[in-house]
Regions:
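Conserved short secondary-structure transition element at the edge of the structured enzyme core
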Residues: 148, 250-306
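Conserved, mostly hydrophobic/aromatic
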Residues: 6, 18, 39, 54, ...
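A short acidic, helix-capping loop that chelates divalent metal ions and anchors anionic groups
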Residues: 24-29, 92-98, 223, 296-299
């Protein structure tokens, strides 16, 4: 797997990142999606496939994802320095008035807790997991700048700020005026059928040289090709367990996109998921993929070997 520069930074990451949001997470039935043993198997498969960009958050599995990543590094021979590890802060992590948001107290406490769980003294990339309307932008940008100055954080990013490009612009303009570290990475929802960021948001990332790492690059599995018009929502599937999955994705417009995706996948003798990820890679983004099994992860990583012709890329873009 190749390494690519993340936006205008000097940080190189694997062209496909591995997201750990399923680690320790309970679904609607109370079943843990990915337990510790499976988490280690997935991390092994990702690293053995050449991956070196791991994405997590303090609230994934109530901290278990970070803890397991830290334990995985301790029990494996992989060099932590050869990996880029990203985490996120914002959501409640303790039950007191300062236990969430982007206020200085919560930010600094959260980063300390993240580092302890990961068993490291720094995190390569720290995302703010949401925008905080209650905390002054000046306060959280100054605090984030201090974390970079301390060496506990190397780069700053935003997650799920879309489609409000003005929020990132405002924060980065304050950073520019004050000499603070700016946001240099964005993690929006983006794929062939979720395109809210097309327009102002993507233009903003280009203006500031911000790298884009899409989450949900396969639209929660819709773009894997396992769903079709006739079958509807299969029992026991992720769509059946979700309150809004079917409403969001099971539309005629989205199935028309899926039709083109399946055509291109057939032409390339590749999995639809790999083609959907290749479409994102063609735009210079670094998609963050998740998986419940090593087989799913292998299919996703196959995207690194898929190249679209100009015609195929245009057909997919026009369909979307």
């Amino acid at each position: 797997m190749d390494a690519v520069y993340l936006g205008s930074t000097g940080l190189q990451v694997s062209e496909i990142g591995f997201g750990t949001w399923r680690f320790g997470r309970e679904d609607a039935t109370g079943t843990v999606e990915v337990g510790k043993q499976r988490a280690f198997e997935l991390l092994d498969a990702y690293a053995e496939g050449g991956g070196r960009f791991i994405d997590t958050a303090d609230m994934y599995g109530d901290g278990l994802a970070e803890t397991w990543i830290g334990e995985w590094f301790e029990t494996r021979e992989w060099d932590r320095e050869s990996f880029v590890v990203a985490s996120k802060v914002y959501w409640p992590t303790r039950g007191d008035p300062n236990g969430d948001g982007l206020g200085r107290k919560h930010l600094r406490w959260s980063v300390d807790a993240i580092l302890e769980r990961l068993g490291t003294d720094y995190v390569d990339l720290l995302y703010t997991h949401r925008w905080d309307d209650e905390t002054p932008v000046e306060e959280f940008m100054r605090t984030l700048d201090g974390l970079v100055a301390d060496g506990r954080v190397h780069y700053l990013g935003t997650s799920t700020f879309e489609p409000n490009a003005w929020k990132v612009s405002r924060a980065n303009e304050i950073a520019r005026q004050r000499g603070y570290e700016p946001f240099t990475v964005a993690q929006p929802r983006y794929n062939l059928v979720d395109r809210e960021i097309v327009g102002n948001y993507l233009e903003m990332t280009r203006e500031y040289g911000i790298g884009v790492c899409p989450w949900s690059p396969l639209a929660g599995g819709f773009l894997t090709g396992k769903y079709d018009r006739e079958s509807g929502v299969p029992e026991g599937s992720r769509a059946a367990r979700s309150d809004d999955f079917g409403d969001r994705y099971f539309t005629e417009a989205n199935f028309r996109v899926l039709d083109v995706l399946l055509e291109v996948a057939n032409e390339l003798d590749a999995a639809p998921a790999a083609v959907a990820l290749a479409w994102l890679r063609e735009q210079g983004t670094v998609p963050i993929v998740g998986a419940r099994t090593p087989g799913q992860l292998e299919t996703n990583l196959d995207a690194a070997g898929v190249s679209l012709t100009e015609s195929q890329y245009e057909r997919l873009s026009e369909a979307a």
